[in-house]
């Protein structure tokens, strides 16, 4: 298992985070956790796992572009 970490720089509400988590799961990621203090405008870190480093790279690309 490979681990990926994605930074969401400006979270307005939990829906923003759930959108990224759905993209991760829809593209083969598992065991998603996020770390956000709940403050509007603060950053959030999303930690996820996938079978290979290549899959992690693909998921990160999707998150950055979609």
Per-segment meaning from a language model:
Residues 12, 31, 63:
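Residue-level signal for functionally critical sites in structured catalytic/ligand-binding pockets
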Residues 7, 37-38, 59:
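General helical structural elements
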Residues 16-17, 21-53:
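Acidic, low-complexity, intrinsically disordered interaction modules
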Residues 5, 53-55:
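Compositionally biased non-globular segments, especially hydrophobic aliphatic-rich helices
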Residues 1-11:
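Short glycine-/aliphatic-rich beta-strand segments at the starts of folded cytosolic domains
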Residues 20-24, 56-66:
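Short amphipathic alpha-helices in soluble, non-transmembrane regions
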């Amino acid at each position: 298992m490979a681990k990926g970490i994605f930074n969401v720089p400006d979270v307005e509400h939990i829906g923003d985070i759930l959108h990224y988590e759905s993209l991760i799961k829809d593209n083969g990621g598992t065991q998603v956790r996020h770390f956000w203090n709940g403050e509007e405008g603060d950053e959030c870190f999303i930690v996820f796992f996938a079978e290979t480093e290549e899959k992690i790279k693909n998921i990160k690309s999707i998150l950055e572009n979609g």
